[in-house]
Swiss-Prot record:
Annotated TM spans: 22-42, 67-87, 94-114, 117-137, 153-173, 200-220, 243-263, 281-301, 308-328
Summary of the function given for this chain in its UniProt record: Part of the ABC transporter complex BtuCDF involved in vitamin B12 import. Involved in the translocation of the substrate across the membrane.
Cell compartments where the protein resides: Cell inner membrane
Molecular function GO labels: vitamin transmembrane transporter activity
Record bears the keyword Transmembrane: yes
Presence of keyword Methyltransferase: no
Membrane topology note: Multi-pass membrane protein
Main location: membrane
Paired cysteines (S-S): none
Lineage, broadest ranks: Bacteria, Pseudomonadati, Pseudomonadota, Gammaproteobacteria, Enterobacterales
Pfam families associated with the record: FecCD
UniProt protein name: Vitamin B12 import system permease protein BtuC
HAMAP family, per database record: BtuC (MF_01004)
Key words, A-Z: Cell inner membrane, Cell membrane, Membrane, Transmembrane, Transmembrane helix, Transport
């Protein structure tokens, strides 16, 4: 068989395998979504969703929360995958590189300076601005200082620690109950999400869909600067567009649910290890897997304690930290 036919056959098999992965992930998200609507202090299975109790528990309380969880999980996972490609760092992730903390500190300072009287829309925009500033700062370090992967990771962690310290000082010196409640919320949680936050949830959707369709551009960027330019890709323009998209997704996610770590790190790596490496399929796969995993984590956060709720950030950190350590031992290119 000629080499060209062999290559075409292998490419066809790989695409078929990638599409099968996406189908399985879609089925997994559907199961997790149904389970999320059913789980809680009062369990209501699909056969009971037409009853009076379901009108409150399923359609008014759990449905908006489940939709928010899905979109935030998808956004964080896709943002993590794009950051890993953009920074050429296998351990890049919104939480680890301080982007989520940048959004958080902007939100906390807005509440502190505004005495809790500013509208929710303004606070959400401040979170987006904080995420954008942190992402552009990291990108500037990566490009101008020629930092190695390890140094960039350390810079991101250090910036995240500084942001966490600023938030802690702000809470310590504040007598505002809103700010103290906000600090608990910054641990990650969807407890206050209902239909009133639908505009924040919808704000994620167009940017998320656009980013999931940029696999071709990311594949070109992975070839290197010279090859990407030869293929007609404007690297400066695309980097700025991708940074804006990442900042938007992370900022809105933080405004909606607080800081949730490790989703953007673990999900892309798990999918790559399963053989999903083409960015055109990896990004939609990350969206589906991130939605399903965060739905499962949200159910765990809701049902673990009786009449109480764990911060979802605690659940993802408990599961993600061991996986992060394992990934550190596997990534040989981190120098």
């Amino acid at each position: 068989m000629p080499a060209s036919q062999t290559f075409t056959l292998l490419l066809h098999k790989q695409r078929h395998r990638d599409k099968r992965h996406l189908l399985l992930l879609t089925l997994g998200v559907a199961v997790a979504f149904v389970f999320s609507l059913s789980a809680g202090d009062v369990w209501l299975w699909p056969s009971q969703w037409s009853g009076e109790a379901a009108q409150l528990f399923v359609w008014q309380l759990r449905l908006p929360r489940a939709l928010a969880v899905m979109l935030v999980g998808a956004s964080l996972a896709v943002a993590g995958a794009v950051m890993q490609s953009l920074f050429e760092n296998p351990l890049a992730e919104p939480g680890l590189l301080g982007v989520a903390n940048g959004a958080g500190v902007a939100l906390v300072l807005t509440v502190l300076l505004g005495n809790g009287l500013l509208p929710v829309a303004f606070m959400s925009l401040s979170a987006i601005a904080g995420a954008l500033v942190m992402t552009f700062l990291l990108l500037s370090f990566a490009r101008r200082k020629r930092l190695t992967n390890a140094r960039l990771l350390l810079v991101g962690v250090a910036l995240g620690i500084v942001c966490s310290a600023v938030m802690t000082w702000a809470v310590y010196f504040s007598s505002s109950l809103d700010l103290r409640q906000l600090m608990y919320w910054m641990m990650g949680g969807f407890g206050g999400v209902d239909w009133r936050q639908k505009w924040l949830v919808l704000a994620l959707l167009p940017v998320l869909l656009w980013l999931c369709c940029q696999g071709k551009a990311l594949n070109f960027m992975a070839l290197g600067e010279v090859q990407a330019r030869q293929l007609g890709l404007s690297l400066h323009l695309w980097r700025n567009l991708l940074v804006l998209a990442i900042g938007w997704l992370v900022g809105v996610s933080v405004a909606l649910a607080g800081v949730i770590g490790f989703v953007g790190l673990v999900i892309p790596h798990m999918l790559r290890l399963s053989g999903l490496t083409n960015q055109r399929y990896l990004l939609p796969g990350c969206a589906l897997a991130g939605a399903g995993v965060l739905l499962a984590a949200d159910v765990v956060a809701r049902i673990t304690l009786l009449s109480a709720e764990l911060p979802i950030g605690v659940v993802t950190a408990t599961l993600g930290a061991p996986l992060f350590i394992w990934l550190l031992t596997r990534v040989k290119s981190l120098r």
